[in-house]
């Protein structure tokens, strides 16, 4: 009996550790912040007079193209943060991701979604919008939405960081979708902070993308039951790659 127990314990001790498989030490968490150390540039003012309905919806408001949104201490919002690599055991997505067309702007401006997941565009304005996905990865679409309340759904086909969304009717309207084939992503909030949970233990490559400043990459070690902290720092000199 004792010999059998000893043999079982020895077998368990010598078994290889495989990240992401059921029965490992448990998942971990990555939390962190995206910062801009340079003074933020001024965002251009949007002139909506070309569409009377857009102009009426924003009357008396100063509407800007919020490409760079920072907190008082440099926290950078709207950065898409994600793990690189393949995670075949990750749970499949449930439900759709929604982007609203409200007051002639896309809201939110940056979202994340998974391959195979549906992204929905809702027209909340009493005017014609056109949802145009500019893709290099078979995620292309171009659909008119002339009626308030109309919803268009598209099932994302392939990974793409990032899928650029425009409106051919209102050229100032823009949004971005980070499409990955796993659930390990987040978008930085108003203070530049983000959290990604339920991550398989191990060493991972993590990336942050921002529409003005491009992509930063680093490695992070995640231990089961623990939280790893990372920080992405943009100096303001970075430039993104070509965008359609």
Locate predicted features.
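Positively charged n-region of N-terminal signal peptides that target proteins for export
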Residues: 1-4
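Bacterial N-terminal signal peptides
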Residues: 7-16
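Extracytoplasmic copper-binding redox domains, predominantly the cupredoxin/blue-copper superfamily
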Residues: 21-244
């Amino acid at each position: 009996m004792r010999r059998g127990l000893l043999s079982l314990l020895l077998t368990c001790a010598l078994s290889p550790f495989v990240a992401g498989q059921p029965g490992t030490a448990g998942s971990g968490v990555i939390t962190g912040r995206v910062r801009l150390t340079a003074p933020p540039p001024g965002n251009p003012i949007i002139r909506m007079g070309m569409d009377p309905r857009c102009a009426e919806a924003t009357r008396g408001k100063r509407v800007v193209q919020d490409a760079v949104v920072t907190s008082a201490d440099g926290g950078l919002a709207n950065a898409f943060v994600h793990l690189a690599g393949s995670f075949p055991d990750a749970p499949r997505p449930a439900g759709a991701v929604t982007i609203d067309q409200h007051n002639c702007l896309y809201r939110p401006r940056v979202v994340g979604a998974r391959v195979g997941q549906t992204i929905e565009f809702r027209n909340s304005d009493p005017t014609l919008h056109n949802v145009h996905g500019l893709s290099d990865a078979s995620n292309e679409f171009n659909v008119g939405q002339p009626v308030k309340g109309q919803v268009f759904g598209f099932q994302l086909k392939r990974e793409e960081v990032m899928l650029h969304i425009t409106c051919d009717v209102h050229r100032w309207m823009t949004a971005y979708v980070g499409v990955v084939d796993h659930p390990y992503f987040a978008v930085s909030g108003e203070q530049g902070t983000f959290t990604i949970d339920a991550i398989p233990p191990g060493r991972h490559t993590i990336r942050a993308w921002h529409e003005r400043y491009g992509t930063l990459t680093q490695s992070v070690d995640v231990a089961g039951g623990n939280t790893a902290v990372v920080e992405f720092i943009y100096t303001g000199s970075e430039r993104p790659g070509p965008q359609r």
